[in-house]
């Protein structure tokens, strides 16, 4: 039987989601737990596939993974979470077709990037973001180059301000490596007056204009959701979600205390503004 899981994680202490030999990753932790519980012996024979990889420090709320198992009764979020570290949580599961591929069958993916600070002209960012909508060659917004197809369809960009935080939501059919972080970097440059909309238009025409762009930091990025043409029959695990909320609250308390500690190390006026 093939099972899909929705996974959330705090990516700060992981070298990305995809398994690596010597570094801690989200998949590495999942593989260990699934094997320990007798749910999956080997990711290759179980045809383990994720909806996509996230880079070092990037977080997720709606990562989707799928695998074959002879023990679907054990492949439940609350069972899996009992062995996972306190920064990774399965929170929903679904029985899916044998050929279900979370990556290839995805209709779209949604990311959220969170910025801190009021130094941006939000009206400029909103105006510039409209240029990115639709089908474009995003070569200038990707770390990888070459013959790989680089045309993507951006379906939605929403920008909201809450206090000192700016949230940028981006939905596309799929994303190139570092594409979201480079889009955010470009919008930050326009919003701060370093660049203008004309430059952004040139960036969308890589055949005539090419420029390297440093991506925004990974710690502000969250994979929010993955959408499929035929909605999956997700079963949310209420107990797993409650326990995850408790752990998230613990992290919030720790980070809030740490923020105050940092504000007293070589304090400045800007330190007080961050709290």
From Swiss-Prot:
InterPro entries cross-referenced by the UniProt entry: PsdUridine_synth_cat_dom_sf (IPR020103), PsdUridine_synth_TruA (IPR001406), PsdUridine_synth_TruA_a/b_dom (IPR020097), PsdUridine_synth_TruA_C (IPR020095), TruA/RsuA/RluB/E/F_N (IPR020094)
Enzyme class: isomerase
Domain of life: Archaea
Binding sites annotated in the UniProt record for substrate: 111
Location of the active site: 55
Keyword presence, Isomerase: yes
Family: Belongs to the tRNA pseudouridine synthase TruA family.
PANTHER family in UniProt: PSEUDOURIDYLATE SYNTHASE, TRNA PSEUDOURIDINE SYNTHASE-LIKE 1
Name the record gives this protein: tRNA pseudouridine synthase A
Record lineage: Archaea, Methanobacteriati, Methanobacteriota, Stenosarchaea group, Methanomicrobia
Gene field: truA
């Amino acid at each position: 039987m093939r099972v899909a899981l929705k996974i959330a994680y705090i990516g700060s202490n992981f070298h990305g989601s995809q398994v690596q030999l010597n570094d801690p990753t989200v998949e590495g932790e999942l593989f260990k737990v699934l094997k320990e519980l007798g749910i999956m012996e080997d990711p290759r024979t179980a045809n383990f596939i994720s909806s996509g990889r996230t880079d070092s420090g990037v977080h997720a709320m709606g990562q989707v993974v799928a695998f074959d198992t002879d023990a679907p009764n054990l492949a439940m979020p609350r069972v899996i979470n009992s062995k996972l570290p306190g920064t990774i949580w399965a929170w929903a599961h679904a029985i899916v077709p044998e050929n279900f591929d979370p990556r290839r069958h995805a209709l779209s993916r949604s990311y959220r990037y969170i910025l801190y600070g009021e130094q941006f002209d939000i009206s400029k960012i909103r105006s510039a973001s409209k240029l990115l909508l639709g089908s474009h060659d995003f070569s200038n917004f990707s770390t990888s180059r070459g013959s790989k197809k680089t045309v993507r369809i951006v379906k939605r960009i929403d920008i909201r301000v809450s206090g000192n935080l700016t949230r940028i939501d981006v939905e596309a059919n799929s994303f190139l490596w570092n594409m979201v972080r480079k889009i955010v970097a470009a919008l930050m440059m326009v919003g701060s007056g370093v660049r203008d909309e004309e430059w952004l238009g040139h960036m969308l025409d890589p055949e005539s204009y090419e420029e390297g762009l440093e991506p925004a930091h990974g710690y502000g990025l969250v994979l929010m959701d993955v959408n499929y043409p035929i909605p999956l029959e997700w079963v949310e695990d209420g107990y797993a979600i409650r326990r995850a909320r408790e752990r998230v609250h613990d992290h919030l308390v720790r980070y809030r205390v740490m923020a105050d500690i940092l504000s007293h190390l070589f304090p400045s006026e800007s330190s007080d503004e961050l709290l």
